[in-house]
Amino acid sequence: MKSIYITGYMGAGKTTIGKALSKELHMDVVDTDQKIEEKQGKVIRDIFAEEGEMAFREYESEMLCSLPVDNVIITTGGGIVEREENRKWMKENGTVVYLYCDPHVIAERLREDTTRPLFQKKDIDAFVTKFESRRAYYEEAHIHIDTTNKSVKQIMNELKEKINE
């Protein structure tokens, strides 16, 4: 089976659904952000602060292309879709899943999360604007799942059905 790439905005459920899908399909799951942190020896927040977003996006593209393209679930960072080369790579090397969640619901989920470098608690409008700027890229995915106010079980049932179509 080709790789399954899980995309979506921060807080949409990529990591949670990736882990659940991994158990269900008996496939390994790899998180691009975690792999970048391991390779760079620092957390993403520090990469953004010390090297900037452009450096992080370069690490992200390099990491994406270094991962297996068969029998693995890859959970991605929310901004991986910003680079056309990344979108092309994922579409050519696997099935791309877009987890959509209403950005206002995400903002509520992330209100107290200090590990998200692009989430500004005080500026929900900027958060929604960033989401909307990426939306067309996310929608290039093969499979779309709306996770808004759904349980993991509901999302998994819908995702399994669409993967098997």
Curated annotation (Swiss-Prot):
Q: Which residues bind ATP?
A: G11, A12, G13, K14, T15, T16, R116
Q: Which cofactor does it need?
A: Mg(2+)
Show the CDD domains listed in the entry: SK
* InterPro entries the record matches: P-loop_NTPase, Shikimate/glucono_kinase, Shikimate_kinase/TSH1
Q: Which UniProt keywords apply?
A: Amino-acid biosynthesis, Aromatic amino acid biosynthesis, ATP-binding, Cytoplasm, Kinase, Magnesium, Metal-binding, Nucleotide-binding, Transferase
Presence of the UniProt keyword S-adenosyl-L-methionine in the record: no
Q: Which reaction does it catalyse?
A: shikimate + ATP = 3-phosphoshikimate + ADP + H(+)
Q: Where does substrate bind?
A: D33, R57, G78, R134
Which molecular function terms from Gene Ontology are attached?
ATP binding; magnesium ion binding; shikimate kinase activity
Q: What range does the record give for the signal peptide?
A: none
Presence of the UniProt keyword Magnesium in the record:
yes
UniProt family annotation: Belongs to the shikimate kinase family.
Supply the name of the protein. Shikimate kinase
State the organism of origin: Bacillus anthracis (strain CDC 684 / NRRL 3495)
